[in-house]
Amino acid sequence: MKAVIFAYHDMGCQGVQAVLDAGYEIAAIFTHADNPAENTFFGSVSRLAAGLGIPVYAPDNVNHPIWVDRIAELAPDIIFSFYYRNLLSEEILHLAPAGAFNLHGSLLPAYRGRAPLNWVLVNGESETGVTLHRMVKRADAGEIVASQRVAIAQDDVALTLHHKLCQAARQLLNSILPTMKCGNIPSVPQRESDATYYGRRRPEDGLIDWHKPVSTVHNLVRAVAAPWPGAFSYNGSQKFTIWSSRICPDAQGALPGSVISVSPLRVACADGALEIITGQAGDGITVQGSQLAQTLGLVAGACLNRPPATSGKRRIRVLILGVNGFIGNHLTERLLDEENYEVYGMDIGSNAISRFLLHPRFHFVEGDISIHSEWIEYHVKKCDVVLPLVAIATPIEYTRNPLRVFELDFEENLRIIRYCVKYRKRVVFPSTSEVYGMCTDASFDEDKSNLIVGPVNKPRWIYSVSKQLLDRVIWAYGEKEGLRFTLFRPFNWMGPRLDSLNAARIGSSRAITQLILNLVEGTPIKLIDGGQQKRCFTDIRDGIEALFRIIVNEGDRCDGKIINIGNPDNEASIQELATLLLDSFDKHPLRCHFPPFAGFQVVESRSYYGKGYQDVAHRKPSIDNARRCLDWEPSIAMRDTVEETLDFFLRSVDIAERAS
């Protein structure tokens, strides 16, 4: 059987050797060039392949059509991926008749995603493992072929667990590969309800929070111990790294982060003390704890983890226009969670952002973007990243007020885009899933799908074409004027503070809010055209995390990109959404305060929205760009989102007033 292998790291070397030992013919190996900035403590797949006389390649983009064609010419019977760091396109996955199989470093469906080795230690797990599974479009979601459990000892650190996993992987592959070679490939579906997903870990994630329980801090030390970057803290402006530690139950009443003793070196946490066994000051050498205390000049009672001294690097200033809106207020919360962001915002109200008004890094002005142009231009010039989030984005308004939609959504936003061009500022612009219109593709691709709208006499398309035209103008400014931009397209984001029940009362709200209002007031749930239209509903937390990563823009990977942000797995019809919502409503502890359910009522779209409306049968995103550019995968189930959204709205109702 002929195999093509994608491999990297020690696991890649183990996988290649196991495939050879099982008698497969390896036509080619694809790997990565080592990153000079990374500590390459692990084995080299390229050197192994070269020594074995096997062709080896390290393309920047293995999914490019040129490489897809070259792999097709190799005519593989089977494809293996052993710790290859990039997702493989569906075109590649479909090249092998026997299928494509990936080795993942956890017991799937738990710990899908990146860095499972480190995450299981961070979370204090007592068991992990390795899993061989079929590869599908979605990362780590295919059927399981085989798995092997690995116990995590209390003294395991990242490197010792890494060695255990490599050994388990070799045993697993030695056991299953001969069977697969004979064409017998048993597999069982993963249980989606048990799936968990974790993203990439960064060196800065090793910062210790001494207010956490001592076990949490100790587990962080274990999870990122050498050769990983390490858990670290500060003594004033001096950074130090902790390489090994142990838990001491008694903090002697000391405040978290304070030094209890220097020999041994012990630091108070929330519920105990951490004894630092070995550590390193700055870029120095590794020493035992008491010597580290001496090097840092620590004394009992000293307080660690103070902010580093001013380094001259100012915070990133983010301008959010429409900051009080659904996306704006949630994004503000995410940005303020990070110390290096400062948020400037404008909106016509502040009810959703009242919790931030006293925050020292949040600066708000109440105003209208169509009036306060001087303030906006000044702050575009002042800030680093601009997000013009102001738009009319409810379907009934497209037919009620098409000219107002055009004036606000296109004309006012175009002026802001031109300020960004003038002052050479990066813009992160909210396009919309509506731009795809009546596209017939099974899933909508940012770079390939056609944007199809209806006739001119259907004003519901005014929003879609206003956004599409701005997309094209922004793209042209990028090509001709060097504007730095990213366009993101949200697909039906839902969550708390989506809009308001008052907006639903006048028909100017999102679908789920209207449905909740019907339940609250005991009126029939109206299913427009039977509610058969399908959408992919996305939790606001998933959406905001993706948007935050666009703002971070690691390696400038988002520049000039269009990125869908949605959850393809949460596809449901409006009728299914209503049924799920009703089920959650009936189970809610406040259910007894509201009227009986009044049933469903089928309504024609023309009578509800007016003659200028057209609907769309389905709207499902491809999220390959988000996976590639953001290392992002949505993880929150639709039921969780519905329950949380419902809970927010029900608790916003004045129960006492209703009772009276």
Swiss-Prot record:
Sequence segments annotated as region (Dehydrogenase ArnADH): 314-660
Keyword Lipid metabolism: yes
Active site (catalytic residues): H104 (proton donor), E434 (proton acceptor), R619 (proton donor)
EC number(s) from the headed UniProt entry: 2.1.2.13, 1.1.1.305
Annotated source species: Salmonella paratyphi A (strain AKU_12601)
CDD domains to which the protein is assigned, alphabetical: Arna_FMT_C (cd08702), Arna_like_SDR_e (cd05257)
Binding residue positions for (6R)-10-formyltetrahydrofolate: R114, V136, K137, R138, A139, D140
Residues the UniProt record annotates as site (Raises pKa of active site His): D140
Protein name: Bifunctional polymyxin resistance protein ArnA
Pathway: Nucleotide-sugar biosynthesis; UDP-4-deoxy-4-formamido-beta-L-arabinose biosynthesis; UDP-4-deoxy-4-formamido-beta-L-arabinose from UDP-alpha-D-glucuronate: step 1/3; Nucleotide-sugar biosynthesis; UDP-4-deoxy-4-formamido-beta-L-arabinose biosynthesis; UDP-4-deoxy-4-formamido-beta-L-arabinose from UDP-alpha-D-glucuronate: step 3/3; Bacterial outer membrane biogenesis; lipopolysaccharide biosynthesis
NCBIfam families: PRK06988.1, PRK08125.1, PRK11908.1
Site (Transition state stabilizer): N102
Keyword entries, A-Z: Antibiotic resistance, Lipid A biosynthesis, Lipid biosynthesis, Lipid metabolism, Lipopolysaccharide biosynthesis, Multifunctional enzyme, NAD, Oxidoreductase, Transferase
